[in-house]
Amino acid sequence: EKERASDKTGHIDITQLTLDENLSIPDLGKQARKIRTAQSREMKRLQKARLSDLKLIRNYEVLKATLSASNLFLPNDTVLSDRADIYLRPFLAALRVPDFYHVMLVMHSDDTGSEAYSLDLTRARAHAVRDWFTRNGGNTDFVVIYEAGAFDPIASNETLEGRARNRRLDIYLIPGEKMVDMARRGELDK
């Protein structure tokens, strides 16, 4: 296994990991059941907003939300639209407590532009989302940005509808050390 970079406290530097590596940690051990329960509660809370496609992955330990980029940005723009606030605000609670969640922002595009354009666009859009969270009181110390460009389509890029589905933001809420520690101390249910 490759050696993982650590910060000055000895914690793994999540910014140096691939998305797949981030999605595979932490090993929850005995706390898995409590974490799954907490993630189910968080999913139910987010479902009330009815603004994104939600699912639990990795044995129900990681919450994945998918938001349409058209709800966040104007076409080919990197500035958040006025209505983006409606879609992003429900996720602020996940960023209130530092290291409660490791949040992965994965921005996708369709394949209508060049590879370089798509990567630049998705990078700028993901940064705009992270900056919005910061401006609105979220702690973004444990937020990692991934620009996916057009590399991971979920629909055919041959149709308008397919391209619209491919332009999306995936938000992954991965249990952080604070959440695991709270589960260990029996404080997660409070």
Each language-model region and where it sits:
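Second-shell loop/turn segments in exported
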Residues: L28-R33, L72-S81, E115-L119
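A broad, low-specificity signal for short, low-complexity segments enriched in glycine/proline
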Residues: Q16-L17, S24-K34, L63-L67, M104-V106, ...
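Short, well-ordered turn and helix-capping elements at secondary-structure junctions
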Residues: A69-N71, D77, G149, E158
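Periplasmic OmpA-like peptidoglycan-binding domain that tethers envelope proteins to the cell wall
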Residues: H108-E187
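Soluble periplasmic/extracytoplasmic beta-strand elements of cell-envelope proteins
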Residues: K55-I57, V62-S68, L72, H102-V106, ...
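N-terminal targeting leaders that direct proteins to extracytoplasmic destinations
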Residues: E1-N59, M179
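Periplasmic peptidoglycan-binding/anchoring modules of Gram-negative envelope and division proteins
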Residues: Q39-R58, F73-M107, T134, I171, ...
